[in-house]
Amino acid sequence: MTDAAVSFAKDFLAGGVAAAISKTAVAPIERVKLLLQVQHASKQITADKQYKGIIDCVVRIPKEQGVLSFWRGNLANVIRYFPTQALNFAFKDKYKQIFLGGVDKRTQFWLYFAGNLASGGAAGATSLCFVYPLDFARTRLAADVGKAGAEREFRGLGDCLVKIYKSDGIKGLYQGFNVSVQGIIIYRAAYFGIYDTAKGMLPDPKNTHIVISWMIAQTVTAVAGLTSYPFDTVRRRMMMQSGRKGTDIMYTGTLDCWRKIARDEGGKAFFKGAWSNVLRGMGGAFVLVLYDEIKKYT
């Protein structure tokens, strides 16, 4: 293998391992966030059964579905997240070579910053094309509030993918893809762009104390998450449309979804579960720091 291939493989492995560990740790928070986002568009959750907030959700889930249901959809998430995050990190460095080749970060700061934004956004969008059906399945599995057996909408990852494919074809597995690309570019641009720029401004980036790295990463993930959150809410709502027919369809398209959420639920609805997303972001910050630490030893 060439040095470039070895470097790419190390990026892929380091990013994937770090992501799988952190995602499993924050899976319960992830499920709470998803339920708060999509409950209004769920056929299983009637108006009188909707969760009132994070605490209500955390209390009711183990009572109604069992403690292990906090990790519902986590297997799909780990399977999805390993290639997603690994590809993001690997492609990010490849895109950095394209956008930042010959750019001096000290004398061309804004060009350097723009290059980091572009490389981060392009990496996220590229990865999404490959793993979107898994992201879709993870959302639908996490949104399934049936207790067991016949009450469940899907029996697992394979059952979810097969049922939606039979019902709606490949298009059903990519429901909400366009708004996802918009959101992922905004999120990844901030996630990678600001983080790399901030670290690049430090005197000795490679030997930065882990606490400083974590603080930078925590700020970046919180800002990036809140900025792109409305896009995430809309894409999750669109994912809930797959498998529906006739009058069961709530939104005719992405623009209709934006309009109806704003009209019927108000602007706050775009940020349902946002606080749990900030908590979940601690896992994202941990990924960035862990990735840098793993790379030091590879």
Curated annotation (Swiss-Prot):
Which is a GO BP term held by this UniProt record?
B cell differentiation
Query: How does the record say this protein sits in the membrane?
Result: Multi-pass membrane protein
Xref: PROSITE patterns:
SOLCAR
Task: Kindly indicate where the leader peptide sits in this chain.
Answer: none
Q: Where in the cell is it found?
A: Mitochondrion inner membrane; Membrane
Modified sites of kind N6-methyllysine = 52, 147
- Residues with PTM N6-malonyllysine: 23, 92, 96, 147
What do the Gene Ontology cellular component annotations say? membrane; mitochondrial inner membrane; mitochondrial nucleoid; mitochondrial permeability transition pore complex; mitochondrion; MMXD complex; nucleus; plasma membrane
| Major site of localization recorded for this protein | mitochondrion
Q: Which InterPro entries match?
A: ADT_euk_type, Mit_carrier, Mitochondrial_sb/sol_carrier, Mt_carrier_dom_sf
Record region (Important for transport activity): 235-240
| Sequence ranges of the Solcar repeats | 6-98, 111-201, 212-297
Mitochondrial intermembrane topological intervals: 1-7, 100-109, 200-210, 292-298
Residue numbers of N-acetylthreonine PTMs: 2
Keywords, comma-separated and alphabetical: Acetylation, Antiport, Chromosome partition, Host-virus interaction, Membrane, Methylation, Mitochondrion, Mitochondrion inner membrane, Phosphoprotein, Repeat, Transmembrane, Transmembrane helix, Transport
> In this chain, where does the modification Phosphoserine occur?
7
Record bears the keyword Acetylation? yes
Which GO terms label this protein's molecular function in UniProt?
Answer: adenine nucleotide transmembrane transporter activity; adenine transmembrane transporter activity; ATP:ADP antiporter activity; oxidative phosphorylation uncoupler activity; proton transmembrane transporter activity; RNA binding; ubiquitin protein ligase binding
Q: Which residues carry this modification: N6,N6-dimethyllysine?
A: 52
What are the transmembrane regions? 8-37, 75-99, 110-130, 179-199, 211-231, 274-291
Positions annotated to bind ADP:
80, 92, 235
Comment, domains: The transmembrane helices are not perpendicular to the plane of the membrane, but cross the membrane at an angle. Odd-numbered transmembrane helices exhibit a sharp kink, due to the presence of a conserved proline residue.
Q: Which family does it belong to?
A: Belongs to the mitochondrial carrier (TC 2.A.29) family.
**Annotated protein name in UniProt:** ADP/ATP translocase 2
**Lineage of the organism:** Eukaryota, Metazoa, Chordata, Craniata, Vertebrata
